[in-house]
Amino acid sequence: MVTMKDLLECGVHFGHQTRRWNPKTKKFIFGVRKNIHIIDLQKTLRYFRYTYNIVRDASAQGKSIMFVGTKKQANETLKEFAESIQVPYVNYRWLGGMLTNFSTIRKSVRKLEIIEEMENSGQIDLLTKKEKLMILRKKEKLDKYLGGVRHMKKIPDMIFVIDVAKEKIAVAEARKLHIPIVAPLDTNCDPDLVDYPIPGNDDAIRSIRLFCKEMSEAILEGRELMQEEIVHADENSEEIEYVSNEEKEEMLAEIQKEITQGAE
């Protein structure tokens, strides 16, 4: 789990310039240095550990967690960690309706799958050069926007967001659907929009990497706990005696007979 040394080395304590702050973050600010707000790392550490446990427990319950971070400093790091633990992610651009109009998103994902099937079967080679080029461009665009959510069959139970100020649409959709939001909370962000905030820098690459790493580890730890629980339950479960169709029919006949006799 994260330590104070980790936070200092990754520059998690550096907030934004004082003129860009959100007054609601005042309780998380330690002071000012050269017109930059310094975040109170004692509070960061406390919130970090609390949120780590929240994410771990959600994962242990089998809940799905989506990673969101589209800005330049975050997109590659976020993709790396999301793919390493096989969770859905959006790292290029948030398409409106990604959550609130999920059925349409699934249809777009299906288009991507159809194009891939055409490639694998060789069917795409039967098209004209122009048609093939257009379809391959379509595939490239769909994969760019939806590659991270192509295996997501339902909306996530929780989202982890890098920079809630930038990802306004994603945050608004999650809040509309009452999906809990986990996020680093920089000094320019609104704490009221985040269910599980972690006061800290959401711009520096090292800081972003630390947040992604810790949330990924929390998810993996939760999965391990869930697996242990399943194994433990299997060891203690009694052998189930299945009822045959004949026994079911016999039992239903007896019940029907009792009902008839009771009516008389």
From Swiss-Prot:
Origin superkingdom: Bacteria
Gene Ontology cellular-component terms listed: cytosolic small ribosomal subunit
Keyword annotations from UniProtKB, A to Z: Ribonucleoprotein, Ribosomal protein
InterPro entries, per database record: Ribosomal_uS2 (IPR001865), Ribosomal_uS2_bac/mit/plastid (IPR005706), Ribosomal_uS2_CS (IPR018130), Ribosomal_uS2_flav_dom_sf (IPR023591)
Example of a GO biological process term: translation
Gene Ontology MF terms in the entry: structural constituent of ribosome
SUPFAM superfamilies in alphabetical order: Ribosomal protein S2
Keyword Ribonucleoprotein: yes
A Pfam family that the UniProt record links to this protein: Ribosomal_S2
Similarity-based family: Belongs to the universal ribosomal protein uS2 family.
HAMAP family registered for this protein in UniProt: Ribosomal_uS2_B (MF_00291_B)
Name by which UniProt lists this protein: Small ribosomal subunit protein uS2
Species name: Helicobacter pylori (strain Shi470)
